[in-house]
UniProtKB/Swiss-Prot annotation:
It comes from Homo sapiens. Residues 112-121 have a biased composition (Basic and acidic residues). Coiled coil: none annotated. This is SIN3-HDAC complex-associated factor. Its main location: nucleus. It is found in: Nucleus. Keywords: Nucleus. One of its GO terms (biological process) is positive regulation of cell population proliferation.
Length: 221
């Protein structure tokens, strides 16, 4: 089995005097034989000499076979294989910037995440204030049941975890209750006295009459 055959490369220190190539698959030759045709074949305005690659030699031979009066030349190959020019080397790279639509979409997604996190926190606060849990009562006395708390954010809730933006304080005949948006009722036993039920039960239940006293005899013995 034969290994991969790598073609042999020929190199020139100064490079081809026409295209500036420094390596070629063919040998470099002296340009003296072709220098007289450089001006017409490659459109040069100066004299060039030195090594010339086989590709440029073939272009000179092709130019010689052109019909008389032809103005065709291969000026485009002059210095075509030279190293990168100073202009190309110093050309700044374009910095990719985010388009307006992409920036706007990133801002919207960020706001949506903040909104979802805020709603999650509010939901957890409301769940902690649910009547199903055992509330932690404050040490407020019964004497303060008829005192209305200040409105707005300055009023202090009865429960430390009570969210007054959800629970609305209402005063009824039996005391103070807190009513939610969906009809839930939160009661503090320190501020609630079931007077209504007691009065109703007392009105429905007839008064029990005691046993009649025995008549006292006035007869003298």
């Amino acid at each position: 089995m034969f290994g991969f055959h790598k073609p042999k490369m020929y190199r020139s220190i100064e490079g081809c005097c026409i295209c500036r190539a420094k390596s070629s698959s063919s040998r470099f030759t002296d340009s003296k034989r072709y220098e007289k045709d450089f001006q017409s074949c490659f459109g040069l305005h100066e004299t060039r000499s030195g090594d010339i690659c086989n590709a440029c030699v073939l272009l000179v031979k092709r130019w010689k076979k052109l019909p008389a009066g032809s103005k065709k030349n291969w000026n485009h190959v002059v210095d075509a294989r030279a190293g990168p020019s100073l202009k190309t080397t110093l050309k700044p790279k374009k910095v990719k910037t985010l388009s307006g639509n992409r920036i706007k979409s990133n801002q919207i997604s960020k706001l949506q995440k903040e909104f979802k996190r805020h709603n999650s926190d509010a939901h957890s606060t409301t769940s902690s204030a649910s009547p199903a849990q055992s509330p932690c009562y404050s040490n407020q006395s019964d004497d303060g049941s008829d005192t209305e708390m200040a409105s707005g954010s300055n009023r202090t809730p009865v429960f430390s975890f009570l969210d007054l933006t959800y629970w609305k304080r209402q005063k009824i005949c039996c005391g103070i209750i807190y009513k939610g948006r969906f009809g839930e009722v939160l009661i503090d036993t320190h501020l609630f006295k079931p007077c209504c039920s007691n009065k109703k039960a007392a009105a429905e239940k007839p008064e029990e009459q005691g046993p009649e006293p025995l008549p006292i005899s006035t007869q003298e013995w």
